[in-house]
């Protein structure tokens, strides 16, 4: 974290990231525990939604988020997008709950039992992942593993679609999908991705994304910093604060893209599960409203999912700017001090 030259900074209880700044083992523990929280939410909320699901009301007109996403994967639904078998849904939920306990145990072990620094652990291969925030070689090595695993996730998604199928909103059935591997399609879609209306194109995009991510991951794993470590590559600003700012920028950008996609695209977000497409309105800030006739005080899943993605993305970007400026050395306390001293300031005209 930015210390502005103070060798012994202190942080408030709310600055949780500060406790993991120079302790790679604690940083890993926080990541594992966070994964456990996400898995617990996914499993528990799926069971909660399943207990409240009303088959007489369209899924998209109910306050659901987990069930619609499972339904798009063809889990538990049949023709017409109706839930026909709750067993695979329950299995998915329970699996997430079991994994959340495993992650929680891992987080606690790394936080309480294992060494606070990975470099001091007794396992040789684990020490390879020890890092310092200003060490580009170690950071690019770890980045490579992240990219490679994300690529494997894309491969898994493509293979699921090929062998188990996805829900096709145009046909109203769950069907297998063979990816369209035309690179021209992928290139053109980046300029008009909101209009994609083919599951084959969607899976083709994920297949190419898997290739790019895994190739980039291998590059970062087997190579060190190419060329001299210059300011352009982060020398002087490569820090925990800078890394946090870039992470917030990435998450914020993905949230904004998801908001626009969810608002208008019925291939990826079928109206059977998420409700009708939305209208974009403007007030103090942009917002989306339902086009369906719904009872007073009720909204489609698409409406609140779109709006919450947009506003979370907006504030993530603000967080990115805040931490990026701090990483560059800007001290926001100077702003508050300047405002506080405005009354006593004097202005001279020469």
Swiss-Prot record:
Q: What is this protein called?
A: Divinyl chlorophyll a/b light-harvesting protein PcbB
What GO molecular function terms would the record report?
chlorophyll binding
Keywords, ordered alphabetically: Chlorophyll, Chromophore, Membrane, Photosynthesis, Photosystem I, Thylakoid, Transmembrane, Transmembrane helix
Write down the superkingdom of origin.
Bacteria
Q: Could you give one GO CC term from the UniProt record? A: photosystem I
> Which factors induce or repress this protein, as stated in its UniProt record?
By iron starvation.
Q: Which Pfam families match?
A: PSII
* Similarity field: Belongs to the PsbB/PsbC family. IsiA/Pcb subfamily.
As cofactor, the record names: divinyl chlorophyll a; divinyl chlorophyll b
Task: Give me any GO biological process, just one.
Answer: photosynthetic electron transport chain
Residues annotated as transmembrane: 27-47, 89-109, 141-161, 202-222, 244-264, 305-325
| Annotated source species | Prochlorococcus marinus (strain MIT 9313)
The protein's topology relative to the membrane is: Multi-pass membrane protein
Task: Tell where it localizes.
Answer: Cellular thylakoid membrane
Q: Which NCBIfam families match?
A: PS_antenn_a_b
Record keyword Membrane present: yes
- Function text: The antenna complex functions as a light receptor, it captures and delivers excitation energy to photosystems I. The Prochlorales pcb genes are not related to higher plant LHCs.
- What does the subunit section of this Swiss-Prot or TrEMBL entry state? The antenna complex consists of divinyl chlorophylls (a and b) and divinyl chlorophyll a/b binding proteins. Under iron-starvation forms a complex with PSI, consisting of a PSI trimer surrounded by a ring composed of 18 PcbB subunits.
């Amino acid at each position: 974290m930015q210390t502005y030259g103070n060798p012994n900074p202190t942080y408030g209880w709310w600055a949780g990231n500060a406790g993991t700044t120079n302790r790679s083992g604690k940083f890993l523990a926080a990541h594992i525990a966070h994964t456990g929280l996400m898995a617990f939410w996914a499993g528990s909320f799926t069971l909660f939604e399943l207990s409240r699901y009303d088959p007489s009301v369209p899924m998209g007109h109910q306050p659901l988020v987990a069930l619609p996403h499972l339904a798009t994967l063809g889990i538990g639904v049949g023709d017409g997008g109706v839930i026909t078998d709750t067993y695979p849904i329950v299995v998915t939920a329970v699996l997430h709950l079991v994994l959340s306990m495993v992650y929680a145990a891992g987080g606690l072990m790394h936080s309480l039992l294992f060494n606070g620094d990975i470099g001091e652990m007794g396992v040789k291969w684990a020490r390879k992942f020890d890092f310092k925030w200003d060490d580009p070689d170690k950071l690019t090595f770890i980045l490579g593993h992240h990219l490679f695993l994300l690529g494997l996730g894309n491969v898994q998604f493509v293979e699921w679609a090929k062998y188990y199928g996805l829900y096709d909103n145009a046909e109203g059935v769950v069907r297998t999908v063979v990816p369209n591997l035309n690179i021209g399609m992928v290139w053109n879609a980046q300029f008009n991705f909101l209009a994609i209306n083919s599951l084959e194109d969607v899976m083709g995009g994920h297949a190419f994304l898997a290739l790019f991510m895994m190739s980039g991951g291998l590059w970062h794993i087997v190579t060190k910093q190419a060329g001299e470590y210059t300011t352009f590559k982060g020398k002087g600003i490569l820090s925990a604060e800078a890394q946090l700012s870039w992470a917030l920028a990435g998450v914020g950008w993905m949230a904004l893209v998801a908001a626009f996609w969810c608002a208008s695209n019925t291939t990826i977000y079928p109206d059977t599960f998420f409700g009708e497409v939305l209208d974009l309105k403007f007030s103090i800030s942009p917002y989306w409203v339902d086009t369906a006739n719904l009872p007073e005080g009720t909204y489609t899943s698409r409406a609140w999912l779109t709006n919450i993605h947009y506003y979370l993305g907006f504030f993530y970007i603000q967080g990115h700017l805040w931490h990026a400026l701090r990483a560059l050395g800007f001290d926001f306390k100077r702003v508050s001090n300047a405002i506080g001293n405005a009354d006593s300031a004097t202005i001279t005209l020469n």
